[in-house]
UniProtKB/Swiss-Prot annotation:
The gene is hslU. GO terms for cellular component: HslUV protease complex. One of its GO terms (molecular function) is proteasome-activating activity. Pfam families: AAA, AAA_2. Keywords: ATP-binding, Chaperone, Cytoplasm, Nucleotide-binding, Stress response. GO terms for biological process: protein unfolding; proteolysis involved in protein catabolic process. This is ATP-dependent protease ATPase subunit HslU. CDD domains: RecA-like_HslU. It is found in: Cytoplasm. The keyword Chaperone applies. The keyword Repeat does not apply. A double ring-shaped homohexamer of HslV is capped on each side by a ring-shaped HslU homohexamer. The assembly of the HslU/HslV complex is dependent on binding of ATP. Its main location: cytoplasm.
Amino acid sequence: MSEMTPREIVQELDKYIIGQSEAKRAVAIALRNRWRRGQVPPPLHQEITPKNILMIGPTGVGKTEIARRLAQLANAPFIKVEATKFTEVGYVGKDVESIIRDLTETAVDMIRNERQVALRQRAEELAEERILDILIPGPRDSSVPRSDEGTRQKFRKMLREGKLDAQEIEIEVSAPKGGVEIMAPAGMEEMTNQLREMFSNMAPGKTSTRRVTVSEAQRLLTDDEAAKLVNEEEVRALALERVQSGGIVFIDEIDKVAVRSGTQQGSDVSREGVQRDLLPLVEGSNVSTRYGVVKTDHILFIASGAFHLSKPSDLIPELQGRLPIRVELEALSAADLVRILQEPENALVRQYGALLASDGLALHFTQDGVQRIAEIAQQVNERVENIGARRLHTVMERLLEEVAFVAPDGSTTALEVDAAYVDSRLKDLAQDEDLSRYIL
């Protein structure tokens, strides 16, 4: 569990997300409260439940990114789902309990990877011994002469120095369990997963023989040994604990299942049903998964939506009450788009610069060039459809399409992207509303 203070969490989020300070503060406090709850002695700490969050704001302003980065900071199991993908129990489609099942799968993979990393050194030692057994065939017991042990040490030294990396050897590694394809109707995913696991467990563990270089064998055998060293029962227990105490569920498009007042239709019945099915998860219930029963009482739920056609008050009252923290995210201005292009650690101008540097092309963006890109993105957002910062991806792709195509030819080794270059590539397109509607 992360021990970062809310201020430190906000500072970390600032590295990747521009603006939206109110939303950052809300999620930072929610994450810190998890650590605080861990310091509260029982039985009171069982009574302290997370305060779920409702983010309200247009698309492309950072709602999803805030939740995703928060999960990375917390090292917590995280899943993003769209409310529109689920249907009420009894209708064809996915039921909401699959959210928790998928979250548990994520946690199991996370714990398993952590255990394999922790056991990496031991796995590397075992892999080294297996490679030496192949390179120096013969019995390895107390009756082995000392001269053979000396030979083994010589080969071990050569192996560690990389002198044998190019040599080819035959190795045996555990073969992945054969998948059994089972066709089933929508909504029966859990049952088909259990059947698939049952059939795969019935088959004996198989190995496959491969001829590879020594360097490749070291990697494959290390992975193989690490997988054998991991205690699956321990992984399951730790995964269930981490999901229950630290899981984060991000429910996007929650506004699409809100029923607008005065517009009750046949399809709206199912929308309200999805809300009622979500309610037990959000307020706390037990969900059966293939790894055991998961209690959702202390899972943090972050719901988000644009609420263009509906209002948060159109959600059923019970669900509104389970999302007590409301945060409004502001639409992005041209100044925000300039900062998004330059300031984050994963800024777009850095990404494109690194990509084209692979072809030996040095890309340089001037300040007025960045400003012009942001202005064009803002203009298209205002005239066509406001998709926030995602518009920058579209504009940048169009701007650098030609240079990305010719860069491998070596005809250009440096390019300065200034306002004049941006206008030459995008001005006519941005001003033609019909073209920008379909291309930008």
